[in-house]
């Protein structure tokens, strides 16, 4: 089973700590969600894995081998990002042919099929594509290269709702037909919540959660009701956030829910992934504003 292991990786840009001693292992044939606020370190981590940026310390291993400046191992991964490395003067079809030279498993027929499905004009030059179709072009490349590990950094940037839904549908289909690992870094958390199997949450350059989506959602719940009753229930529990409106209060909790010992005035409900993410990544001063 192939793995990518990130070991004790740190990266600083002048005074900004982008990554702080990050360690995590990515397994094959999974769909991960890499979630974090702007500037949390998501893109830096993906750029280090793909050899576009070098860490200050630590290493990235593919099946135990160091990936840095190793072209043989780098062919096992593909990163789709906002930055383009293709000549603006080439058209889409020419880029498909060029990509085949670097990634022998690139499926040209599948790329053409997706182009038709998404309405991408393969005769257009890259510089002629709109923001949305530029993203679609990059997505088609990423879905067609057939690398064991594919990283998608803000994959649906500029896409309308119809194209986003189509992308998620195609992603699930290609994953089912040809299992491999996809890592989606996105802010559209609710849209991907039904797709991702494992969640990685990064905050201020550190991994704060890494577990299955199912397990994390099973831990999160809300308790609401009169402030005094909510406070009494939450005493000694892992409360990750709260909102107060007059005499009423909503608390966001992680852990085992115990309704048997709760005041009858309290209401319990599941915590959706987006709300859970927001509460886990709020800064202290932002959380205080909700008190």
What does each of the following model-derived ranges do?
Residues 50:
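Helix-to-loop junction immediately C-terminal to a conserved catalytic motif
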Residues 72, 81-138:
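ABC-family P-loop ATPase nucleotide-binding domains
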Residues 36-41:
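Walker A (P-loop) phosphate-binding loop of ABC-type ATPase nucleotide-binding domains
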Residues 241-291:
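C-terminal coupling/interaction segments
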Residues 26, 58-73:
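Conserved ABC transporter NBD signature motif
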Residues 156-157:
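Short loop immediately C-terminal to the Walker-B catalytic DE motif
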């Amino acid at each position: 089973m192939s793995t990518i292991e990130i070991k004790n990786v740190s990266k600083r840009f002048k005074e900004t700590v982008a990554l702080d001693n990050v360690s995590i292992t990515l397994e094959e044939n999974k769909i991960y969600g890499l979630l974090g606020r702007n500037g949390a370190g998501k893109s830096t981590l993906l750029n280090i894995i793909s050899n576009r940026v070098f860490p200050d310390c630590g290493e990235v291993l593919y099946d135990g081998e160091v990936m840095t400046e190793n072209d043989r191992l780098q062919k096992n991964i593909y990163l789709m990002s906002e930055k383009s490395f293709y000549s603006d003067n080439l058209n889409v079809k020419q880029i498909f042919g060029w990509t085949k030279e670097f990634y022998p498993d690139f499926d040209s027929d599948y790329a053409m099929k997706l182009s038709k499905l998404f309405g991408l004009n393969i005769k257009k030059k890259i510089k002629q594509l709109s923001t949305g179709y530029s993203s679609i072009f990059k997505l088609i490349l990423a879905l067609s290269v057939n690398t064991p590990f594919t990283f998608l950094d803000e994959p649906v940037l500029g896409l309308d709702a119809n194209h986003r839904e189509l992308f998620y549908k195609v992603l699930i289909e290609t994953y089912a037909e040809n299992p491999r690992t996809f890592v989606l870094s996105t802010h559209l958390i609710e849209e991907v919540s039904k797709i991702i199997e494992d969640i990685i949450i990064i905050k201020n350059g550190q991994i704060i959660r890494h577990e299955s989506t199912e397990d994390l959602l099973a831990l999160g719940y809300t308790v609401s009701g009169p402030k005094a009753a909510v406070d009494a229930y939450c005493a000694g529990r892992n409360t990750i956030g709260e909102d107060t409106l007059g005499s009423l209060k909503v608390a966001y909790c992680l852990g085992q829910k115990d309704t048997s010992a709760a005041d009858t005035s309290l209401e319990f409900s599941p915590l959706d992934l987006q709300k859970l993410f927001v509460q886990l990544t709020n800064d202290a001063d932002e959380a205080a504003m909700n008190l």
